[in-house]
Amino acid sequence: MTNRRGKRVNWWQSKAYVGLLLVLMIMPLLWPPFPPLDDVPTHMGRFYIQTGMAGAPTLSSIFSIDWMPVGNLGVDALVYALHPLMGVEPATKLVIILIPLLSAAGLLLIAREAHGELPATAAFALPLIYNYAFHYGFINFSLGAALAFLLFGLVLRYQRLKMPTVWRTLILLGSLLIYFAHIFGWVVFGLLVVGNALYRHVTSWKISLAMVRAVVLECLLLALPLIPIVAWRSGDNQGETSAFFAIFDKWGWIESAMRDRWVKWEGLSALLCVGLIGLGIVGLMRMSRRLLLVFLVMAAFYIFIPYAFFGLIYADMRIAPLMLAIGILAIAPRPAWGRTAASAIALLALAFVTARSVATTISYARYADDHARWLKVLPSIPRGARVVALVAPPCPRGWNVPRIIHLPSMAIIRRDAFVNDQFDMPGAQLVAVGPSIPRDFAYHSSAQVRLPGCDRPEPLLADRIAQIPRGAFDHLWLLGVDPANRPKADWLRPVWSDERSALYAIVRQKTSSAAKAGPRG
């Protein structure tokens, strides 16, 4: 078999090899009942609110939905479309499985189009799909980035085929699609398109007006999302921008690009990715000039972007692994090395993907088992209850932190209960908590506490319990609180407990008849 250049197709360029890589990419997500990513329970709670409040009077009396052109709707929209067929939890799992699948397909397509064939090194980039942002549960962003990679690969393909109407339409309409998935996915797509435009039109160090004009016109195809952005980011929806030039954090985000559970394994994996890019930069490996320019554009953006960008936190952390992935796609073995050396490199790349996938599968299975133990309390929560959850994560917090801070949202999905775990992000979420729940206990920011002896900024558990508005809630759920630190107040009646968590019914004091009658005499 030969490729489009008439060259023999090597085994690492075959459909079977690509299919194997795609299977390895989805393997970690197949076993857990729901993806064990940090923020996913809160996202699923939001999806449930957006789709199922008609049969949940407690939720419908507390939550409201404000439909607006938010650049944060990718997984929301897909789950909304799929939930009538399978329910919110299976729909969420299916959509999240699609994210690494689309990402891998996009990255491999980019590499193939940039090099004219799939290089033996391309698979080294795939483990970066399971990056820190993905483990954190930034699923709308991850979907936006996956679409950005896939559409950019198609743009390169149709530019090669000299079909300008098709690739321009892909950029124009693809920008809008990616924006609605997540605004920062659109930013990623923009970086890819800008780098590619520089490659196509800047042909010498002597920059002419014609070059500038061609680059600008190509980049203007990205501008369609500015229309909903103006509507969305007007008024009070501006969002915070802060922490410019936190240079010392930049290397940390690169080092933790694949942060999940094992600090040495994930740190060394990230360093391997950096080392591979370094081999290309110093000239030991061949580099695609096109993808090198895209990588440099992303690197410049990464250096200058702040931590918080128009209300989007961890902005620079999200870019780091994607930048590394493009850098790896830019490299390829030199033709002079021969097929044997290239085959050995492809085997090493496959081994790396397999090892990363197996490790992530084990990690996710452990998180899923841990979640099942934490959620044994759910049957004891009355359907339609109003629950205030207080979570005390381990102190100090290291590389591997139990993913429990958003587990209370599972009571929204499985018990139709209100829990104070939705995000308070004006202008970035459709769901808001109504006035029947005091704002100090309405959102996720109210849920985290610390135990005595823990030197962290969260409030002490005892202080937070004393502040609970008893009239607004009927249950208290403590997670990560050992028996020695649990409250013994008269107004808290134990309902369920184990060594790590406890559920209490909040006993409301009844007003005595004498008090109702008022003072005499």
Predicted regions and their residues:
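Short acidic/glycine- and proline-prone juxtamembrane loop motifs at membrane-interface regions
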Residues: 136-143
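Short hydrophobic/aromatic helix or loop-helix immediately within or flanking a transmembrane segment
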Residues: 45-52, 63-88
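Transmembrane-helix motifs of polytopic, lipid-linked glycan transferases
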Residues: 94-114
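Short periplasmic/luminal acceptor-recognition loop of GT-C membrane glycosyltransferases, typified by
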Residues: 367, 377-459, 468-481
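Hydrophobic/aromatic-rich transmembrane helices and adjacent perimembrane loops
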Residues: 310-338
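Transmembrane catalytic cores of multi-pass membrane glycosyltransferases
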Residues: 32-43, 54-56, 63, 71-72, ...
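Signature aromatic-anchored transmembrane alpha helix within multi-pass, membrane-resident enzymes
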Residues: 329, 333-358
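Transmembrane-helix signature of polytopic, membrane-embedded enzymes
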Residues: 107-129
